[in-house]
């Protein structure tokens, strides 16, 4: 596996967005709606402000560690022991989250298009793609991710626009939903919707411009775009569906566009969106494997990481 030492600012932002936004395609906004009710928009705005504030605070703290990722900082603070603990935790976390997301997405594909195919075979396709990408180069993964990220965000924006005719604005009432405590206190847990921004603290050592100013720019742009997409998706789902409706195993964003058509020859636009989302999840898994391999390289101090690729993909 050939490596790439440095990435540009826009490539770094694309890496963060693909990881943090992919959950929107599944059921993240729906989970917020079910738990919070009609005050979901207020809650999402609230947690978005908190996420932006926390990102600003962390960016300020990072000024003294320009060009260092979370493992370099851990080694500085607690030596190799803390570095290894943090590294193992991050690897386990990435594997756990990736496994859940890919499983959920493959379940959606199984229900919608491949009812006669066992979901394990669908998962295997994603794993094989990630394995091949890991053997080719990180450069290819990062460059491809930049294109897929643009298509993914564009597809989400079109999805939001298509939902406008189906919106019923009375569904925002009561504005406070189940009350202030549920919206602002209990709903504070939804700030973990931004946990994909963890990637932000893995990339400083990969940046072409490792200055604190550039890191701050990447952090703010990433969290703002993620916040905007989360707010828009929540607005679309709240105004298009009743908030008490639970749509199990099928992406609510898919249902938003499934009843739209463009003329006689393009009657199923959702198929095109699914294609983009499949590419997006493949890229997501490629990135997850890439970061795990980079972490393992730091922890075990080896130059050739290829022997880890197949066992990692099997996990």
Language-model-detected regions and their locations in the chain:
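Hydrophobic, membrane-embedded alpha-helices of multi-pass small-molecule transporters
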Residues: 8-27, 43, 47, 51, ...
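Membrane helical hairpin/interfacial module
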Residues: 25-119
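Small-residue-rich segments of transmembrane alpha-helices in multi-pass membrane proteins
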Residues: 77-89, 148-163, 223-231, 313
């Amino acid at each position: 596996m050939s490596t790439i030492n440095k990435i540009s600012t826009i490539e770094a932002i694309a890496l963060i967005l693909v990881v943090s936004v992919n959950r929107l395609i599944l059921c993240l906004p729906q989970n917020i709606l079910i738990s919070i009710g009609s005050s979901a928009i207020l809650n999402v705005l609230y947690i978005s402000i908190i996420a932006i504030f926390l990102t600003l605070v962390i960016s300020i703290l990072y000024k003294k560690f320009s060009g260092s990722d979370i493992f370099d900082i851990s080694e500085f603070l607690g030596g190799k022991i803390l570095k290894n603990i943090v590294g193992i935790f991050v690897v386990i976390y990435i594997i756990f989250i990736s496994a859940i997301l890919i499983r959920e997405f493959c379940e959606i594909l199984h229900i919608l298009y491949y009812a006669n195919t066992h979901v394990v075979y669908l998962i295997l396709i994603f794993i094989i793609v990630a394995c091949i990408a890991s053997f080719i180069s990180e450069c290819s993964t990062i460059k491809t991710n930049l294109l897929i990220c643009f298509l993914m965000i564009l597809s989400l924006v079109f999805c939001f626009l298509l939902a406008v005719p189906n919106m019923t604005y009375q569904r925002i009432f009561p504005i406070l939903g189940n009350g202030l405590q549920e919206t602002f206190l209990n709903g504070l847990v939804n700030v973990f919707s931004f946990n994909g921004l963890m990637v932000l603290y893995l990339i400083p050592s990969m940046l072409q411009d490792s200055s604190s100013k550039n890191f701050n720019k990447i952090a703010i742009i990433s969290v703002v775009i993620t916040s905007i997409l989360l707010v828009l998706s929540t607005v679309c789902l709240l105004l298009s569906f009743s908030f008490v409706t639970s749509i199990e195993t099928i992406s609510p964003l898919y249902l938003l566009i499934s009843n739209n058509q463009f003329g006689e020859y393009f009657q199923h636009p959702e198929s095109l969106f699914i294609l983009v989302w499949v590419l997006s999840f493949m890229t997501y898994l490629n990135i997850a494997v890439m970061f795990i391999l980079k972490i393992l390289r730091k922890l075990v101090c080896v130059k050739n990481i290829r022997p880890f690729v197949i066992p990692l993909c099997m996990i």
